[in-house]
């Protein structure tokens, strides 16, 4: 009897986990009318918070462009020796490292603490702290990151970041607030496990009012007889009674109150005191790190091949073949040698999707990293199955976007530090200025697909000559030239144009 019961329990657990993972994928539909965009604008951050060891800048999530795409975006600058406090959010995040290097920890619930201190490390602890009951430190895996990395953070999973380099870390993060993993609302929310941070997406004036209101409530509670003391901080422990926390952690009440960070004014990025942050981690050179990344990708390809074989054999994929605790969360798309598309005189494009980074199947997000050389052109194209949020990394580009009515909804310059949302199916073209143009695009599909309008792999090339000639009312010779004159597929070298310079002059006058 025991075996059938155990089998039944196992099947129930597999079905439950499979259902949970299935629920985490997919996106909610935006409210009706939110994508009726008559004009797009290249946006700068609208909110800025200065912390002890860095700066947090965010774009207004209520802007119609972000409401259409169902996303929120924040840019963080972490100074050397700066620590972004542990936090989790109500929506999955995809983060791109613009500059710098550092380490991060992602805290999956129930996963073992596989990084632990040695006896030698314990001997370095001050004698006053050593005792028979003293525990060696151990924690979950530490991951290194560097410029060009895409990092995936699932919804509700806590994480932290630390800058162990000599230059600031600049990171841009997109939160997919319409993902089914978010069952609250479309407002981006960060839940901190420490400190007294501000709401990154709320204007400063509103934050000051909210902080004043919390302080008044805190003072009123202190004056009420029999009222348990609660902190006035802004992390998840602040609202609990200190006595409850003391019981939960088995510590004294004073230590429990420190969790509430009542008088901490450092905000969400703090400076590590003294020397660098001391955590348990392997010391790798860049070459060793890249070698380990290649091994991880090879293991994932083997796992993916096994999954395909199991599905052909009639077995369902329950999402557990790659253990959650060992998920690879990072992929570098900034390295030129990693390019998926390359044209010698025009530029390159690299992508991260669920084929190259399987965790993105869970997040339902992907990313594109592009570089256009001076005056090069990314041919007109559209995204078949995703919105695209473009962040300009370096340089400038002339960008045009056209909607389903054939109306130009954006015809302007996109500069370093700006964001532009390109809705699904809207056609777009980019042309770099003299200094070139580099960007990263966050896309709201695990395998975002692009369809070019010109070039060797374009929709126009795929049409029969007769169809093209009759549709455009042109001779077949002209139709043939439209189909075959451009042999490149995606990135092309642009030819000089007097009309382009005159258009730029008119825009400058406006």
UniProtKB/Swiss-Prot annotation:
SUPFAM superfamilies: RmlC-like cupins. The keyword Ion transport does not apply. GO terms for biological process: seed maturation. Pfam families: Cupin_1 (PF00190). Expressed in endosperm of the seed. Proteolytically processed from a single precursor to produce an acidic and a basic chain that are linked by a disulfide bond. One of its GO terms (molecular function) is IgE binding. This is 11S globulin.
């Amino acid at each position: 009897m025991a075996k059938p019961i155990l089998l039944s329990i196992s099947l129930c657990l597999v079905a439950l986990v499979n259902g949970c993972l299935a629920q985490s994928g997919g996106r909610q539909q935006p409210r009706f009318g939110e994508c009726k965009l008559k004009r797009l604008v290249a946006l700068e951050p609208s909110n800025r918070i200065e912390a002890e060891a860095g700066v947090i800048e965010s774009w207004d999530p209520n802007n119609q462009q972000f409401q259409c795409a169902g996303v929120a975006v924040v840019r963080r600058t972490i100074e050397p020796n700066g620590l972004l406090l542990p936090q989790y959010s109500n929506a999955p995040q995809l983060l791109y490292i613009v500059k710098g290097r550092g380490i991060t920890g992602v805290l999956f619930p129930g996963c073992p603490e596989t990084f632990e201190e040695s006896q030698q490390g314990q001997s370095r602890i001050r004698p006053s702290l050593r005792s028979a009951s003293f525990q060696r430190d151990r924690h979950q895996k530490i991951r290194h990151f560097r410029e060009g990395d895409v990092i995936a953070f699932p919804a509700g999973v806590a994480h932290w970041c630390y800058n162990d380099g000599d230059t600031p870390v600049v990171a841009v993060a997109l939160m997919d607030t319409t993902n089914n993993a978010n069952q609250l609302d479309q407002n981006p929310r960060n839940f901190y496990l420490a400190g007294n941070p501000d709401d990154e997406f709320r204007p400063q004036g509103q934050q000051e009012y909210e902080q004043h209101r919390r302080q008044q409530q805190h003072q009123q509670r202190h004056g009420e007889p029999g009222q348990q003391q609660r902190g006035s901080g802004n992390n998840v422990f602040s609202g609990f009674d200190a006595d409850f926390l003391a019981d939960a952690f088995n510590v004294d009440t004073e230590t429990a109150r420190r969790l509430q960070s009542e008088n901490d004014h450092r905000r969400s990025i703090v400076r590590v005191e003294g020397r660098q942050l001391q955590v348990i981690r392997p010391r790798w050179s860049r070459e060793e790190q890249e070698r380990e990344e290649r091994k991880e990708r090879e293991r994932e390809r083997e796992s993916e091949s096994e999954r395909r074989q199991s599905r052909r054999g009639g077995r369902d994929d329950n999402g557990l073949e790659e253990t959650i605790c060992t998920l690879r969360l990072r992929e570098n798309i900034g390295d030129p040698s990693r390019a998926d598309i390359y044209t010698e005189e025009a530029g390159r494009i690299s992508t991260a999707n669920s084929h190259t980074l399987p965790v993105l199947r869970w997040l339902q997000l992907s990313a594109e990293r592009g570089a256009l050389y001076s005056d090069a052109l990314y041919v007109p194209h559209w995204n078949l199955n995703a919105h695209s949020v473009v962040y300009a990394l370096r340089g400038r580009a002339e960008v045009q976007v056209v909607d389903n009515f054939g109306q130009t909804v954006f015809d302007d310059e996109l500069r370093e530090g700006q964001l532009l949302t390109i809705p699904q199916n809207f056609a777009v073209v980019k042309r770099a200025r003299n200094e070139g143009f580099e960007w990263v695009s966050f896309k709201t599909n695990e395998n975002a697909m692009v369809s070019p309008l010109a070039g060797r792999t374009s929709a126009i090339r795929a049409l029969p000559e007769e169809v093209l000639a009759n549709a455009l009312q042109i001779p077949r010779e002209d139709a043939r030239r439209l189909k075959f004159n451009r042999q490149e597929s995606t990135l092309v070298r642009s030819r000089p144009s007097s009309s382009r310079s005159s258009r730029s002059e008119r825009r400058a006058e406006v």
